[in-house]
Amino acid sequence: MKIVFAGTPDFAAAALDAILGAGQGAGWTVSLVLTQPDRPSGRGLKLLASPVKQLALAHGIEVHSPVSLRKGDAAATAHARLRAAAPDIMIVAAYGLILPPAVLDIPRGLRDGWKPKLSAINIHASLLPRWRGAAPIARAIEAGDVRTGVTIMQMEAGLDTGPMLMAEQVAIEADDTAGTLTSTLASLGARMVVAALRNVDQLHAMPQPAGATYARKLDKAEAWLDWGDAAPRLQCRVRAFNPFPIASSMLNGATIRIWSAHAVDGPAIFDAREIGLVRAADALGVRVACGVGELLLTELQRAGGRRVTAREFIAGFAVKPGDRFTHPSTVATE
C-alpha cells in the first residue's frame, strides 16, 4: 500500500509516526508528504519546518509544501507530484489546506466497489458532526463540553462532511487545556488510523447525523477576556486558549497573559464599575470579580516576561485589591 500523508502540526506528526512504525511490518510505504510551508518562528523569526516535515525528512521521505492545491502553478505542480507518487490512499490530519475534488481523485482508492472510492481519509479531532472545521479541540473546551473524541472519516469536497468510518470518545477533564487535550487526541488518532489501515475490509461508511456545529479558526483578538462574562465561561476560555492565543487582559497599562485560572463562587455584579476588580491577591492567586462569580488567576505572564505563579506575579507586579483588569477597548475609552 502506497500512502501520501498530508498534515502539519504535532497532532498530525503523531499519526505519521504511527503509520511509519506500523508500516514496517504491514508493507505500507509513505511515498510523499504534503505539509504547510516553513513559517517564521520565535523572536528571531527564523523559518521553522512543521513537525510533520521534520519527521518526514528524518525518515528520508519526499516532502512538498504547496501554497495552494486549488489554482495556479503551485496547484499544478502539487497535482503532478501527487500523480507521480501513485498513492493508493491519502491520509490527512490537520493539514491546513482544503483538498479539492481533483486531488481526492488522484489516489487509486482502497476497497474496490466503494462509490465514491475510498481515496482519502481524514483524522478529525472531534466527534462529528460536532465541531467541524479548523479548531475543534479549543472550541469543545470553550463550549464547556465534557466529552470529545476522534473521528476517522472518508473525505469529500465539503468541510468535514464525509461519511464516518470510525469514532472513539474521551472525557474532557476539568483541568484539560487545548494543549493537553491535543496530546490525548493525537495519541488516540494515531492508534485509530493504524487500526483503520489494518482493517480496511471491515470499515463501514456511516453518514453523519444532523446537528453539525462549526469550529471556526482561533483568532488572536479572541484572547482578550470580557470580565462581564460569568467566571465558569471565562475559565473555559482560559483553558481553550492555552497554548494559543493565550487569554489576555490589561492591568495597570500592561498586557497580562493568563495561563491558568479557576472559577470560584462570588456574587453577581450589578455595578459595572466592579467588573474586573481585583478582590484579593494572596498565596492562592489573584481573585477577579466577573459578571457572575470570580476568577482565581493562578499562572500569569507579563508581556516580555516569563510564565510565573500567582505568588511570583503578585510580588513582582505589586498587584493589590482594588486594581482592575480591563479589556483594551475599555482602556481606550477611559
Residue spans of the language-model regions?
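C-terminal active-site/capping subdomain that shapes the small-molecule cofactor and substrate pocket
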Residues: 235-334
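One-carbon transfer enzymes
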Residues: 1-245, 302-304, 309, 319-334
